[in-house]
Amino acid sequence: IFRCGIENGTSMDADSAKAEYESAEENTDITIPFTFTEPEITTEKMNANLFKDTLGSYSSSAAGGTSGRIHNVGLTASICNGQIVLPGETFSFNGVVGDTTAEKGYQEAAGYQDGKVVQVLGGGECQVSSTLFSAILYTDLDVLERANHSMPVHYVPSGMDATVFWDSPDFKFENNHKYPVKIVMNMDSSDTLTVKILGTKENDYTIEPRVEQIDEMSNVTYRDYKDASGNVVKSESVCASKYKPLNSGS
């Protein structure tokens, strides 16, 4: 008789088990030793550390925009607010927000199209994707997909914007951490949008973005990893941007 009961976190030596089974006499019990493997992150540890740290944050102002634009920024932020990205998962901005239709409550506002400023449904959603990207730049989360606008924008620095449109281009990042991360977005009474990336800090580095100009209309965005003394111990290139001059509008 061969008896075994395998639970989560246990393993056995298959070769030893086979040898014991083959050498055992008929109708006798055999004992197979199991090894208990302690999980790297227990449920208790996970719950105790869940979303306790602000990994990155960024704020941008929508003040001075049309009522439609401010409405669209707030609506998009409310859709993204509270999104949780599990370890190994990919966050897709378009996958969460979807198409910016009137049925969803979106209004017309200024946006870029074919190198011009025109009225489009959902104008302003790119401020949310750009502010999210800017917050992500203060973390070591992997940026998988990001495209710059055709022309510079006013709400984030050059090289820190992320244009989106249904269904492409998209903005995507991967949670390469051991713990989940949560996206928190808030639009306050002064029309300032704040994006925070909450999670569990897994290293002692401080991460800051740096944009290096190549020429007047192109640049490369880096992340600088700094130790406790403020020394840069590592730099990595995140993306390159190339813009055209702004024709008109804002």
What are these regions (language model features)?
Residues 1-250:
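Well-ordered beta-sheet/strand-loop patches within structured domains
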